[in-house]
Amino acid sequence: MPFPIDDLPAAIRTTKAVLRAAMPNRAPVFRALEGDIARQADAILTDRAQGRDTIPVLRFADIAADRVDPASLAALRTRGACVIRGVFDARQASDWNDEIAAYVEANRLDDKLARRAEDRYFGTLASSRPQIYGIYWSKPQIAARQSPALTQARVFLNRLWRAQSEGRVHFDPARAPAYADRIRRRPPGSSSLGLSPHVDGGSVERWLEPNYRRVYRHVLAGDWRAYDPFDAAFRPDVEEIPSPAVCSMFRTFQGWTALTPQGPGDGTLQLIPVANAMAYVVLRALQDDVPDDDLCGAQPGRALSVLPAWHAPLLAALVPIPPMEPGDAVFWHGDVVHAVEDAHRGTGYSNVMYIASAPGCAKNDAYLKRQLPSFLRGESPPDFPADHFETDFTGRARADDLSALGREQMGFGP
């Protein structure tokens, strides 16, 4: 459901007055939380300096064999992100990369990009947007989404969450509905095409929307230590301000799968691997040095920017993901701050397929019903700019390309 706001400054002033009144001790509470964030940032930077993983690295073979060690699981819950090695065979991923390149070239996508619809979602981020293409229905994307391996990885990630709490069952972790997303094809030498640090999945809604306030109920009550980023209570119930390219599904993790080798310096992903970072962002906006009608620069219908002026302790922990090989995947909690490097200083393309992890729930089922006609017609999905590039593309995936699992994940029903 959409969450409309008629007078944003008035809504912010009213909400902040209520939230501040409910937490008269917000200043010392925030100082304690800021100390926790600083300690986590120090640990992350120490790990990086000493050559240890700043982002937990798992092997898909261990997930498949149910032998991921408890220390890795604990690190994943603390850092809010992970790399999964070998979800796909490297040759398979490289072949998919070649197939997508041929699909793009055969259908003259570059000629059509000049007429693409405006993607306003990233408009306020410092460095424009990376080279992300409105391609959703290529056969490699369909094959990857419906693959048993990536499905098993997504179910594993879903199960890291508390799917039942507050006396309710919030979602079915065993289901992995397909959220159709785009591809990135970033050539070497490209610059000023990154994304500055931000969070997806809601900006001003995190303070203004009632269910989002319930998500952060412990934080807003001053008990941030009781806040569990992996408690799913109320998350599938949140409502977003209507906007192109704002995700309408509840994702347990955002993610992408590498199609080419890439790593630090290759114009790829950076993370602030702090799972409880949003507690800091939420409380920061309620401090007395922030104007009454401002939420640290948050804008409706946009990515939630994390800015040096307001969030410097968090930004200290921004680190690159480790080197990735074709077939590896990276996933990060929806509240984890992420960015994309401005410059690609490497020698090869940094190409990925965006494939997130999402569970079965009413919110996601409702989106599948809206997304399915887009697939059948080859149109851009409802959440994305209405480019509709693929309607007449040769080689586009069709319903016949779906496996039984793929049909279920797309919402075809029995």
Write out the residue ranges for each language-model feature:
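Conserved double-stranded beta-helix
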Residues: 2-5, 9, 285-414
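Generic surface-pattern signal
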Residues: 17, 24, 42, 46-49, ...
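Non-heme Fe(II) oxygenase catalytic core, chiefly the N-lobe of the double-stranded beta-helix
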Residues: 71, 76-79, 88-322, 341-347, ...
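Residues that form generic nucleotide/phosphate-binding pockets
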Residues: 18, 22, 36, 99, ...
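Beta-strand-loop-alpha-helix segment that lines the small-molecule cofactor/substrate pocket
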Residues: 82
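Helix N-cap / beta->alpha transition motif
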Residues: 56-64, 89, 199-201, 359
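Fe(II)/2-oxoglutarate
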Residues: 1-78, 395-414
